[in-house]
Structures are given as C-alpha cells and as structure tokens.
C-alpha cells in the first residue's frame, strides 16, 4: 500500500481561517478595507514598529520601496545572489544595476564586510536577506549603511517571527515580509512593509495604490469625494480584505505555528545527525530562528549522488522537496550580462541545496518517514 505524497510545504489552514474569509465574503466589502487596516495595526503592534503597510506581494513591496527611495537608472543596489530572483528583477526593471555579493558558505547570508567591499560611488541601497528563518548580522549591516549614507531594506520574506538579539525582525529600520502560501504566516499571496521612516512609509502607501492619497475604503468610510487625485503615478499592489482576514488569524497563531516548526526542525537535527548532509550553520549572535525552511546540502562526493538525483529519489518515495535557491547571477539573463562574475559560496550551494518537508501540520511520523527515506537513499550509494 503506497503512502500519501508528503509535500515539501503545505499551509496550515483551519476552521478559524475559513470562518474569517467567509465573514468577509458575507460583509459586502471584499477588497482593501477594514480587515486590511486591522492587519496593519496588529502587525505593527506585534513588532513594535512605527508603520506597517500591507501589499499584494513582497515583490510589489520591494518595487515600490526602491522606487520610493528614488532608485533608478544609473544606480546600484547591493544584494546577495543567493535569493529569489525577484529582487534582481525589480532592481533591473527600475533601470538600476544589481550588484551581487557572495554569502557565507554555511549560514547562506551576506556579511557586512562583503557588502562594504561592494559599495561604490553609485550604490544607493542594500537589500540583504534573512535566510530560511535565521537572521542577518543587522548591527554590522546598519553600521555599514550608516557610514556610507545608504538605505538598508531587509528582505524578511523568510523571517516572520524571527528575532535578532531579543527583538523581532522588523522592529527597527525598514523590512519587507512575505505572506506567500509556503511562508510561516500565509494569506495565499501578500506582504507587509514595515518601517520607522514616516516619509518613506507614506510614499510606499501612496505608490501601492495608483499614487492616490487614499484607498477605496477611505473614500467610502470617510465620505471623501468619489474621485481622489493622483499625487504621483503609482501601481496596483493593494491587499484585499479576503487575504487580510486570513492573515489576521494566522498572525494570532504565529507563535504556535513557529513553535511547531521548531520542534519538527529539532527532531530532524536529532534524527539526521551523523549523516553527510551538511545542514546550515547558525550565526554567532543571539537569535530566535523561525524555521521557515529545513535545508540540506547534497554533495555527490560525500553522499554518493548529486542533489537532483537525491530529489528524484525522494519523489520516488512520495516525498517532495525544493531548491532555495539557484543563485540569481546563474540565471540566463544575468549570466549574459555578468559572464565573469564568480561567487564561489553561492555557486557551491546552488548546486547542492535541498529543502525537505517542514510545515506545522506535519506529524512526528512524517519526520521519521523522511529520515528513513534519506537513510535508505544514502545507504544504497555507499
């Protein structure tokens, strides 16, 4: 009898989420409205930040954030190559140039030293990435950004619920969180921009909704004139209340969801100890890991098979997996433009990274199933 397929990730959706979405559907107001405003307020309260702006995706949030910072043609933005390629795409579409830096071989995050070495006369912003639920050396990066007068925008897509030195990621400075379907807090598609910069937050809020000073619900609830004026050209990146209602329930559950992720990750670490799988290293600073991903590095020289063959072997046993990520500079478009760029740690990891199943609704038996499958795969190659 075959086992059900175990995906690499699956959202944890319960009756409370379903009821919250149903309530919005029955309310008569399903687009951006009161649930959106409540989500922004609750998120800001949780982090202790000054401003929170909900958007339809982290990609859209980064787009309007960099635009609000004045990033454009001739500018350079420093970012690690080992991240989802949307970061490089947004920078490029603004007419700027992504300056890719390498990451630490084991934490897969960029250092303040690597970033500072890449700063040039055209550098306007730094977009470092909190990776897999672990956290960046923020103090070092803030020092570098401050010394050079360069904007720092944290990519916190993996870090909702993470803490850096006792404070939530996003509680200080500017950061962008993702609420995509596989994230620790999901609303299917969505994001949150947070900042203590009032002028930047105001412009992001304006740019995410056509460049208007108000949204549709403001005009309805506050009796403003039906056609607001465009202050500057903007985009359509607002989050609907259907999504916001789902996110609100998930926000209430976040601590419990992340605690379950941690318990599962600890079980993996215990169960897979001693196997030649090279799990990620942790930074030296104090942190709370959100365990967005559980990542192995599959090196053919020590495992007896490469990453792609390993993933196929898992699939044959009914187990899903993922790759996070193929380094951005290795994608065809960017390789054509920077053919000589060499980032050894990013490239080594790109060829070996494998994310194995990790999501709150997994059972302890699922961890055992994955561990036994991995042991079997490796044993056959010895």
Curated annotation (Swiss-Prot):
Keyword tags: Aminotransferase, Antibiotic resistance, Lipid A biosynthesis, Lipid biosynthesis, Lipid metabolism, Lipopolysaccharide biosynthesis, Pyridoxal phosphate, Transferase
CDD domains found in the cross-reference section: AHBA_syn (cd00616)
Cofactor: pyridoxal 5'-phosphate
EC assignment: 2.6.1.87
Any single Gene Ontology cellular-component annotation: membrane
Pathway as given in its UniProt record: Nucleotide-sugar biosynthesis; UDP-4-deoxy-4-formamido-beta-L-arabinose biosynthesis; UDP-4-deoxy-4-formamido-beta-L-arabinose from UDP-alpha-D-glucuronate: step 2/3; Bacterial outer membrane biogenesis; lipopolysaccharide biosynthesis
EC class (word): transferase
Reactions performed catalytically: UDP-4-amino-4-deoxy-beta-L-arabinose + 2-oxoglutarate = UDP-beta-L-threo-pentopyranos-4-ulose + L-glutamate
A Pfam family reported for this protein in Swiss-Prot or TrEMBL: DegT_DnrJ_EryC1
One example of a Gene Ontology biological process annotation: polysaccharide biosynthetic process
Keyword Lipid metabolism: yes
Modification sites for N6-(pyridoxal phosphate)lysine: 183
InterPro entries given in the database record: ArnB_NH2Trfase, DegT/StrS_aminotransferase, PyrdxlP-dep_Trfase, PyrdxlP-dep_Trfase_major, PyrdxlP-dep_Trfase_small
GO molecular function: pyridoxal phosphate binding; transaminase activity; UDP-4-amino-4-deoxy-L-arabinose aminotransferase
HAMAP family, per the entry: ArnB_transfer (MF_01167)
Assembly and oligomerization: Homodimer.
Protein family according to the UniProt entry: Belongs to the DegT/DnrJ/EryC1 family. ArnB subfamily.
Function: Catalyzes the conversion of UDP-4-keto-arabinose (UDP-Ara4O) to UDP-4-amino-4-deoxy-L-arabinose (UDP-L-Ara4N). The modified arabinose is attached to lipid A and is required for resistance to polymyxin and cationic antimicrobial peptides.
Protein name: UDP-4-amino-4-deoxy-L-arabinose--oxoglutarate aminotransferase
Organism of this sequence: Pseudomonas aeruginosa (strain ATCC 15692 / DSM 22644 / CIP 104116 / JCM 14847 / LMG 12228 / 1C / PRS 101 / PAO1)
Gene: arnB
């Amino acid at each position: 009898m075959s086992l059900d397929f175990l995906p690499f990730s699956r959202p944890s959706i319960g009756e409370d989420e379903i009821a919250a979405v149903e309530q919005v559907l029955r309310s008569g107001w399903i687009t951006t409205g009161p649930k959106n405003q409540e989500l922004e307020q609750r998120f800001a309260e949780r982090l202790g930040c000054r401003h929170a702006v909900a958007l339809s995706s982290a990609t859209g949030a980064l787009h309007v954030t960099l635009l609000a910072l004045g990033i454009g043609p001739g500018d350079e933005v420093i970012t690690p190559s080992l991240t989802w390629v949307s970061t490089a795409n947004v920078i490029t579409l603004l007419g700027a140039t992504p300056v890719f830096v390498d990451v630490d071989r084991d934490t897969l995050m960029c250092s303040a030293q690597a970033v500072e070495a890449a700063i040039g006369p055209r550098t306007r912003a730094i977009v470092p990435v909190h990776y897999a639920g672990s956290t960046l050396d923020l103090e070092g990066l803030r020092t570098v950004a401050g010394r050079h007068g360069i904007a720092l925008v944290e990519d916190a897509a993996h870090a909702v619920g993470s803490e850096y030195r006792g404070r939530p990621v996003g509680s200080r400075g500017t950061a962008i969180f993702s609420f995509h379907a596989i994230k620790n807090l999901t609303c299917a598609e969505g994001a949150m921009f947070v900042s203590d910069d009032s002028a930047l937050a105001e412009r992001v809020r304006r740019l995410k909704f056509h460049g208007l000073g108000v949204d549709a619900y403001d005009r309805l609830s506050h009796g403003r004139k039906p056609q607001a004026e465009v202050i500057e050209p903007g985009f359509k990146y607002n989050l609907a209340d259907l999504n916001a209602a789902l996110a609100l329930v998930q926000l209430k559950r976040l601590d419990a969801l992340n605690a379950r992720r941690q318990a599962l990750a600890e079980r993996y670490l215990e169960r897979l100890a001693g196997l030649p799988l090279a799990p990620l290293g942790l930074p030296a600073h104090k942190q709370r890991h959100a365990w967005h991903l559980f990542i192995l590095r599959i090196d053919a020289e020590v495992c007896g098979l490469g990453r792609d063959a390993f993933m196929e072997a898992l699939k044959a046993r009914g187990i899903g997996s993922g790759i996070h990520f193929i380094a951005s500079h290795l994608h065809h478009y960017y390789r054509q433009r920077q053919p000589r760029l060499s980032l050894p740690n990013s490239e080594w990891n790109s060829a070996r990274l494998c994310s194995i199943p990790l999501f709150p609704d997994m059972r302890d038996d699922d961890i055992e199933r994955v561990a036994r499958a991995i042991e079997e795969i490796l044993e056959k190659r010895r």
